Amino acid sequence: MADVAEARRRDTTLMGMYLFLASEIMLFGGLFAVALALRLLHPQDVVAASRRLHYGVGAANTVVLLTSSLAVALAVAAAEMGKAKGTVAGLLAAAGLGVGFLALKAVEYGMEIRERLLPAFTPADAFESPAAHLFLDLYLIATALHAVHVTVGVGLLAGLAWRVRRSGLPLPRGATGVEVVGLYWHLVDVIWVFLYPVLYLVR
């Protein structure tokens, strides 16, 4: 009976998480749609603006997040096997990589501010065209919103690692909690995998 109740609780928890993730996909989906519309309406201006972005830094951050996804997957697998040390190691590795992503993004923003690429810190007349201004506005909004999600994810990963280490989340019974946070982190990574080509590789 207890196993049935636990299975139902897990299914309910995962369903709630899937609904939340769907809402996040719709949020970023709207930004992707705007980017596509801009690309179709103003191809030359958008391509010119995209070429000024630091695609090398973006590529490095893509590798960082993909590696963090692997770490989370290993943490979930360890949690399901009841291995607390492996779970903590995977969660902390992913959190550390998340911090690395944010640090690289901060450096990139600093470069872009100095190069007068970010509309929030640059007069409107410094841009080649209104379309370029709008595209770089979209870039800042999308990447900053994503960075907020990464920050939340890092907090969740670190907090969960602390709970597991302190035995506040017994394993494997508490593996669902690790799985839920893992799903969130994977979504954050997938969103970036789409953001990178949409924003940096427009040609």
Residues covered by each model-derived region:
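...captures the hydrophobic TM-helix bundle architecture rather than a specific catalytic motif
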Residues: 1-203
